[in-house]
Design a protein with these regions (language model features):
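Non-transmembrane functional regions of envelope-associated proteins
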Residues: 1-187
Length: 187
C-alpha cells in the first residue's frame, strides 16, 4: 500500500494540475505507523532520556495521517467507506449523511438498510468532509450488474462514492430522491 505521505503528494499534484474532484475508492481505517512513536515504545526503560525526549518531539513530524489530513482539508476530496449488512461493532467515522428527507421520515424510504459500517480514521474523514460507500453485490454468477446509489444506516441516508463525487463535481446543493418498491431513482 502507498504511504499517506505519498497520498498527500498525490492530492497536491492533482490539485496543482487542475483536478476538480478527487475520490479514493479505499477506506483509511487504520493509522499509519509512526516510526518515532514505535522507537519510543521499543526503547522504553533503556534509560536514555535525551533520546526519548528527541523522539517525543519528532512524533508530530512523523504523523503521516496528520500530514495527509492537512492536504485533504478544504479540497473536493471524497473518501470511500464500507457498510455491513450484519450487526458488528462500528469502526471509524462516517461522513455527514445527506438530507433527502427529514430524519423522522427516513423509515418510509425503500432504501436498503445496513446494520453497521467501517469508516475512515476520524482525522482523515473530518478533513475530507465528504464520503461515499464502496459496497457492491455481485449477481449469482459473480458479475456486478448494478449497485445501489444510496444506502441507509439508522435514520441517515448515504450516497455511493460515484454519486458523492458527482455531487461535489457539479456542486449540487440538493438531490431529489424518489424511491419505489423495486428500486430508486435520484434526480
Amino acid at each position: 500500500p502507498w504511504s499517506r505521505e505519498k497520498m498527500a503528494r498525490l492530492v497536491a499534484g492533482l490539485k496543482a494540475a487542475g483536478v476538480h474532484t478527487i475520490g479514493f475508492d479505499v477506506a483509511f481505517t487504520e493509522p499509519e505507523r509512526n516510526v518515532a512513536q514505535e522507537l519510543i515504545e521499543a526503547t522504553a526503560g533503556e534509560g536514555d532520556s535525551a533520546y526519548t525526549d528527541y523522539l517525543t518531539q519528532r512524533v508530530p513530524d512523523m504523523d503521516r495521517d496528520l500530514a495527509f489530513s492537512k492536504q485533504l482539508k478544504g479540497q473536493n476530496v471524497v473518501l470511500g467507506f464500507l457498510f455491513h449488512a450484519i450487526e458488528q461493532e462500528p469502526a471509524g467515522r462516517l461522513p455527514s449523511a445527506w438530507s433527502f428527507v427529514p430524519e423522522e421520515q427516513a423509515d418510509t424510504l425503500t432504501v436498503p438498510t445496513m446494520a453497521s459500517f467501517t469508516g475512515n480514521l476520524k482525522v482523515l474523514q473530518s478533513a475530507a468532509r465528504y464520503g461515499g460507500f464502496l459496497n457492491t453485490t455481485p449477481d449469482a454468477d459473480g458479475v456486478i450488474r448494478s449497485t445501489p446509489l444510496v444506502l441507509r444506516n439508522g435514520n441517515m441516508v448515504y450516497p455511493a462514492l460515484s454519486l458523492a463525487m458527482l455531487r461535489r463535481y457539479i456542486n449540487a446543493k440538493r438531490f431529489k430522491l424518489e424511491t419505489a418498491e423495486v428500486g430508486a431513482t435520484v434526480a
